[in-house]
């Protein structure tokens, strides 16, 4: 049954493990910033914590492939688990409870090294163990598991756990969920990953190529920039948007439910825009649905509670559409490897790095500009960047799409 819908049966427990791990990792995303601000930190200080976390994500995303080649999938995933547990426990005990900013910087950085090593190593495992004819679907299911856990279940769980356990214990419970996820992915999952034998020089050469391609192929660099812009709202909004919503009658708990609904829309439309991209064209999909669509609805999401009097229905509908339009960037995962020619592996490294950097850039923009132009100004900056990504996409020349579509796996966009 699972094989028929594209999930490799031998790795089914691993997919469940990714859902649970990412649920634990993402459960504080929608409420940590407003909690820290309510307890004495400034918006800029809160944003700086998330920016440093984003740097850790970028580093771990970049090196996840190299670690897998050196240590194997399960060991690399276990390393990710250790980074997460140690970083989270230290963050709570020495940073969170005492609001010690320097300690929070260090410990949240360590935590940020965790999930890329865990999740992206499993993704590589899936790629190695799935027949080519079913690879695109299997990769799609991985991203569904990833988004369901991090953005949907994590937010929904927090909206109830905070009421039942309080903020501190909810954060502690994240360790339970990531350990449960690791148990399914590493122990209940009995599949064995046999990594390809490669010389150390070959691994180093591939890593270096992931840097040099940015200079030798400007189209790959442009695609990486577009991928960063794709997720600036995903990681930037949680820094300040919950406080804006609260000013208009939408509490943090209700906001968490809205945030989960937003990314439920993202998951649904990730599937839809994969099909739309094939029919409407990769570039057209990114330009009109991703760039222009996100630019418009980013602004609407900010002003929705203002003009609707805090209407939950209005904000939820606009948020659902915004989350869906983020998926308009799905074809960038096909465009970048295509324009890279033979260097598809290096192109995927660039996309992984860009996905990690977006977790830095979004909060960093809030940190830099919220004191100058306020939350409203930051939203307009986000909108302008989304529109700029449409222009950048227009400038990328790609070969005839029909000749390469069947060779390319999707990159989910959030």
UniProtKB/Swiss-Prot annotation:
SUPFAM superfamilies: MFS general substrate transporter. The keyword RNA-binding does not apply. It comes from the Bacteria. It is found in: Cell membrane. Residues 1-11, 69-75, 129-136, 189-219, 277-286, 338-343, 399-414 are cytoplasmic. Pfam families: MFS_1. InterPro entries: MFS, MFS_dom, MFS_trans_sf, Polyol_permease-like. The chain crosses the membrane at residues 12-32, 48-68, 76-96, 108-128, 137-157, 168-188, 220-240, 256-276, 287-307, 317-337, 344-364, 376-398. GO terms for molecular function: transmembrane transporter activity. It is a multi-pass membrane protein. Its main location: membrane. Residues 33-47, 97-107, 158-167, 241-255, 308-316, 365-375 are extracellular. The keyword rRNA-binding does not apply. Induction: Induced by sulfate, part of the yoaDCB operon. Keywords: Cell membrane, Membrane, Transmembrane, Transmembrane helix, Transport. GO terms for cellular component: plasma membrane. Belongs to the major facilitator superfamily. Sugar transporter (TC 2.A.1.1) family. CsbX subfamily. This is Putative transporter YoaB. It comes from Bacillus subtilis (strain 168). The lineage of its organism: Bacteria, Bacillati, Bacillota, Bacilli, Bacillales. The gene is yoaB.
């Amino acid at each position: 049954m699972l094989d028929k819908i594209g999930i490799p049966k031998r790795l089914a427990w691993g997919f469940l493990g990714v859902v649970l791990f990412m649920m634990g990792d993402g459960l504080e995303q929608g409420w940590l910033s407003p909690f820290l601000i309510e307890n004495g930190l400034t918006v800029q200080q809160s944003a700086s914590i998330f920016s440093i976390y984003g740097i850790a994500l970028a580093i771990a995303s970049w090196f996840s492939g190299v670690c897998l080649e050196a240590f194997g999938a399960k060991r690399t995933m276990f390393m990710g688990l250790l980074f997460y547990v140690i970083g989270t426990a230290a963050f709570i005990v020495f940073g969170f409870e005492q609001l010690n900013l320097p300690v929070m910087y260090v410990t949240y950085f360590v935590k940020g090294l965790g999930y890329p090593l865990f999740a992206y190593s499993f993704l590589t495992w899936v790629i190695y163990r799935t027949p080519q004819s079913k690879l695109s679907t299997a990769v799609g299911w991985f991203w569904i598991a990833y988004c369901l856990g991090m953005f949907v279940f994590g937010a929904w769980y927090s909206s109830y756990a905070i009421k039942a356990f309080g903020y501190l214990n909810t954060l502690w419970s994240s360790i339970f969920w990531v350990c449960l996820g690791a148990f399914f992915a590493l122990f209940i999952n009995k599949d064995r990953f046999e990594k390809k034998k490669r010389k150390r020089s070959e691994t180093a050469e591939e890593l270096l190529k992931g840097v040099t391609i940015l200079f030798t192929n400007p189209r790959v660099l442009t695609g990486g920039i577009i991928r960063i812009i794709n997720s600036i709202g995903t990681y930037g909004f949680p820094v300040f948007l919950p406080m804006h919503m609260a000013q208009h009658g939408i509490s943090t708990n209700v906001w968490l439910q809205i945030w989960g609904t937003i990314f439920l829309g993202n998951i649904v439309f990730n599937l839809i825009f994969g099909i739309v991209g094939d029919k409407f064209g990769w570039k057209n999909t990114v330009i009109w649905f991703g760039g222009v669509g996100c630019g418009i609805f980013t602004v609407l999401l900010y002003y929705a509670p203002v003009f609707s009097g805090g209407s939950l229905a209005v904000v939820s509908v606009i948020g659902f559409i915004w989350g869906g339009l983020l998926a308009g960037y799905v074809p960038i995962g096909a465009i970048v490897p295509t324009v890279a020619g033979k260097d598809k592996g290096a192109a995927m490294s660039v996309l992984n790095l860009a996905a990690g950097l977006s977790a830095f850039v979004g909060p960093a923009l809030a940190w830099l500009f919220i004191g100058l132009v306020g939350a409203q100004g930051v939203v307009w900056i986000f909108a302008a960047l989304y529109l700029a990504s449409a222009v950048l996409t227009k400038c990328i020349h790609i070969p005839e799409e029909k000749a390469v579509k069947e060779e390319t796996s999707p990159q989910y966009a959030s």
